[in-house]
């Protein structure tokens, strides 16, 4: 898995940063892409990346501000033109279905696939055999969600060396043993696959927040995450301004990462007042509190768990 930052700016696009969108690439895990927010020109950013719209399975919208949703109609239309025909699910606050459907209807856009809308409330919003996703309210004036994506633990690897030491040669029997089955070998021995499977591989946790000021709900969403993606619209000494505008500072994000025991913090949603050099200063001050911090730039790619 990896995170691809398609847009990392706040409010309006700038020369250095487009508005918000983040792709969670899970090509190795489930051959799909999940998208978190879709600001204006997100599809242009996708053309500059390795992402293919045909792989897009789900879109998660954090809130209904324009810099997080204005890219949806064009992206959905282009997906159709490019041959995307698999169903797509869009999760988000109340109003997301009306916004998308109205935009497509008034523009006369017909899609080659079905969109399923899930207008969410806090709690579990998706689960299958591989992942579960929960959402909770943040604090941004309008309803804004944070998402917690949990990869379920994976079965441990089959210990081929141990099998070889016990005189079991590689072959079709390995698949049955990997499934934990009890197998009778050609020589009459009966062995239990569970005795040859290693410890389960712990799944990853990714927390991706929408716009927010400091709020108690953040802690549970971020707790023990492998990666926390948090807005940092303002520098640390502008906490009062950040609160008034319902946003966060670098230091507030770093303090949350430290308290929540996350492994890596990635700062995004950077105000256009900070050019690339000033953004480096934002990173430096966040690192004074939480060392394993990165600041995202457009088209930056972060492998999960590295």
Swiss-Prot record:
Binding residues for Zn(2+) 1: 63, 65, 140, 211
Catalytic center residues: 67 (proton acceptor)
Cofactor(s) for this UniProt protein: Zn(2+)
Cofactor mode of binding and number, as noted: Binds 2 Zn(2+) ions.
Domain of life of the native organism: Bacteria
Gene Ontology MF annotations: 3'-tRNA processing endoribonuclease activity; zinc ion binding
EC number: 3.1.26.11
Binding site for Zn(2+) 2: 67-68, 211, 269
Alphabetically ordered keywords of this record: Endonuclease, Hydrolase, Metal-binding, Nuclease, tRNA processing, Zinc
Protein family (similarity comment): Belongs to the RNase Z family.
Record function comment: Zinc phosphodiesterase, which displays some tRNA 3'-processing endonuclease activity. Probably involved in tRNA maturation, by removing a 3'-trailer from precursor tRNA.
Record text on subunit structure and interactions: Homodimer.
Name under which the protein is recorded: Ribonuclease Z
Organism this protein belongs to: Listeria monocytogenes serotype 4b (strain CLIP80459)
Gene behind the chain: rnz
């Amino acid at each position: 898995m990896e995170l691809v930052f398609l847009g990392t700016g706040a409010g309006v696009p700038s020369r250095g940063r487009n508005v918000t969108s983040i792709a969670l690439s899970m090509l190795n895990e489930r051959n799909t892409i999940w998208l978190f927010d879709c600001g204006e020109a997100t599809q242009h950013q996708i053309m500059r990346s390795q992402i293919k719209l045909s792989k897009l399975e789900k879109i998660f919208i954090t809130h209904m501000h324009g810099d997080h949703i204005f890219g949806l109609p064009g992206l959905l239309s282009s997906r159709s033109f490019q041959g995307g025909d698999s169903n797509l699910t869009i999760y988000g606050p109340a109003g997301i279905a009306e916004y998308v459907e109205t935009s497509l209807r008034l523009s006369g856009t017909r899609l080659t696939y079905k969109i399923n809308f899930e207008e969410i409330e806090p709690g579990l919003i998706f689960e299958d055999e591989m992942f579960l996703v929960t959402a909770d309210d943040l604090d941004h004036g309008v309803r804004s969600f944070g998402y917690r994506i949990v990869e379920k633990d994976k079965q441990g690897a089959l210990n081929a060396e141990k099998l070889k030491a016990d005189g079991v040669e590689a072959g079709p029997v390995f698949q049955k043993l990997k499934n934990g089955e009890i197998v009778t070998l050609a020589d009459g021995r009966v062995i239990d696959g569970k005795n040859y499977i290693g410890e389960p591989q712990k799944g990853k946790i990714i927390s991706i927040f929408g716009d927010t000021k400091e709020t108690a709900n953040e802690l549970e969403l971020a707790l023990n995450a492998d990666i926390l993606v948090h807005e940092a619209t303002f520098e640390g000494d502008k906490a009062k301004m950040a609160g008034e505008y319902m946003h966060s500072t670098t230091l507030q994000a770093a303090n949350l990462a430290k308290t929540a025991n996350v492994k890596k913090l990635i700062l995004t949603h950077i105000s256009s007042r900070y050019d690339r050099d000033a953004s480096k200063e934002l990173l430096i001050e966040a690192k004074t509190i939480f060392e394993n911090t990165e600041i995202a730039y457009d088209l930056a790619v972060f492998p999960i768990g590295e």
